Amino acid sequence: MIKYFDKNNEVFNLIKDLTGRLNVEILEINIFRNKNNGKIQIVLYSKNFSLDIDFLTDLHKIILLILEANLKYGFTLELSTPGIDRKIKSDREFKIFEGKKIKLMLDNEFEEGFILESKPKSFIFKTDSKEVNVFYSDVKKARLV
């Protein structure tokens, strides 16, 4: 159920050096295009500091300049943060959210616990009563709480 983040995305490759230098993770990029223009939505996160409105406004200006110089179509740009109950959508988000509390569905019920450690194909999930190694392919749903 959990998909793999596409690092071959053109927008990702244009901004990854900038966000990396700022200690900001790119969680998700959505690109919507029609004949004349498009919309680019980017979800960002930082473990080290809060991404407040002033920071996002400044970052928006820089990313917009980078994308306008390189993309051959018109677009609008939206930057946002993940929110407190974000669905975890890719395997790499388990690494990004290590130490965070999540609700996890493996069978048909949600269970609350923490992401202790993320590995290449799995992660350690800790509840009040157990620690278990969970393969990403076994995850039906996961979200932050």
Curated annotation (Swiss-Prot):
Pfam families: RimP_N (PF02576). The keyword Cytoplasm applies. GO terms for cellular component: cytosol. InterPro entries: Ribosome_maturation_RimP (IPR003728), RimP_N (IPR028989), RimP_N_sf (IPR035956). It is found in: Cytoplasm. One of its GO terms (biological process) is translation. The keyword Cytoplasm applies. Keywords: Cytoplasm, Ribosome biogenesis. Required for maturation of 30S ribosomal subunits. PANTHER family: RIBOSOME MATURATION FACTOR RIMP (PTHR33867:SF1). Belongs to the RimP family. This is Ribosome maturation factor RimP. It comes from Borreliella burgdorferi (strain ZS7). The lineage of its organism: Bacteria, Pseudomonadati, Spirochaetota, Spirochaetia, Spirochaetales. The gene is rimP.
